[in-house]
C-alpha cells in the first residue's frame, strides 16, 4: 500500500461522509424551486475547501447561481493551476427508474449510486482531496485556485460575465477541468479541448 492509499484508508469514513454531504444537496440548476439548494451546496463547498487548507473560500454572486472561488498561494512566483468544476446536477426524473433515492447515496457493488456522484461532485471532490493530501504532506509546489459554478447543466449562462469581471482573481497558467469523459472504466482519457454546446432537432416520420 502506497502513501496515498494509506492516507485514504486512514481517513475513509470522513472522506465518504464529506462527499455524501455534497451529494445529499439537490442542487438542480434547471428547476427554480431549488434556488436555496444551490446556495446551500455552494456554501458547503466553501466549507470543505477551507477544511482542505485553502487560504480563502468565497461564495460569490453572479448573474445567476453563486460561484465558489478558493485559492492557496504557496509561492507568488510559482505557476498557478485553476481547477474548474460545477456543483449543479440534472433533475433526477423519472424517479421510478431509480433503485435507491437519487439524493441519498447508496453503495452497491463497490459503486456510489446517486445523482451527482459522477457528474460532477465526485470528480471535483477527488481533486480537492488530492490538493489536501499534497498540502498536508508538504508536496504542493504550485499555487492552486478553484472555481466551482452552479449552472453548467443549463449552459453556464453566468460564467462568461463572471470571468470577465474577475480576470485578475482567476489568472492562472493552466486550467484543469474536472468534467470530461473516460473512454472506459479501466482506460482514463485526457481531453485537451472543449467546444461548447450544439443542439439538433431530429424529426422522424413513417
Stretches found by the model and what they are:
Residues 2-95:
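N-terminal helical capping/dimerization or prosegment-like subdomains
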Residues 15-18, 101, 198-201:
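Short coil-to-beta-strand
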Residues 20, 69, 145, 199-203:
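Beta-strand secondary-structure signal
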Residues 63, 85-87, 109, 117, ...:
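Fold-independent oxyanion-binding glycine-rich loops
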Residues 78-148:
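Active-site metal-coordination/substrate-binding segment of hydrolases
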Residues 80-82, 173-177, 199-201:
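Short glycine-aspartate micro-motif
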Residues 118-193:
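Acidic/histidine-rich catalytic neighborhood of metal-dependent amide-processing enzymes
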Residues 189-205:
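Flexible glycine/proline-rich, aromatic-decorated loop/lid segments
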Amino acid at each position: 500500500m502506497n502513501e496515498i492509499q494509506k492516507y485514504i484508508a486512514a481517513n475513509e469514513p470522513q472522506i465518504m461522509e464529506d462527499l455524501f454531504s455534497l451529494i445529499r444537496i439537490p442542487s438542480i440548476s434547471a428547476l427554480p424551486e431549488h434556488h436555496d439548494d444551490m446556495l446551500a451546496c455552494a456554501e458547503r463547498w466553501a466549507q470543505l475547501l477551507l477544511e482542505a487548507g485553502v487560504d480563502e473560500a468565497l461564495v460569490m454572486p453572479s448573474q445567476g447561481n453563486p460561484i465558489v472561488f478558493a485559492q492557496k498561494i504557496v509561492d507568488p512566483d510559482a505557476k498557478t493551476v485553476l481547477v474548474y468544476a460545477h456543483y449543479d446536477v440534472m433533475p433526477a426524473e423519472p424517479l421510478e427508474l431509480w433503485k435507491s433515492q437519487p439524493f441519498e447515496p447508496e453503495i452497491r457493488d463497490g459503486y456510489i449510486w446517486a445523482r451527482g456522484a459522477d457528474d460532477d461532485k465526485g470528480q471535483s471532490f477527488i481533486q480537492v482531496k488530492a490538493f489536501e493530501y499534497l498540502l498536508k504532506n508538504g508536496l504542493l509546489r504550485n499555487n492552486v485556485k478553484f472555481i466551482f459554478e452552479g449552472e453548467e447543466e443549463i449552459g453556464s449562462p453566468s460564467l462568461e460575465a463572471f470571468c470577465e469581471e474577475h480576470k485578475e482573481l482567476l489568472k492562472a497558467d493552466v486550467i484543469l477541468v474536472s468534467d470530461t469523459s473516460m473512454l472506459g472504466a479501466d482506460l482514463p482519457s485526457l481531453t485537451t479541448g472543449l467546444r461548447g454546446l450544439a443542439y439538433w432537432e431530429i424529426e422522424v416520420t413513417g
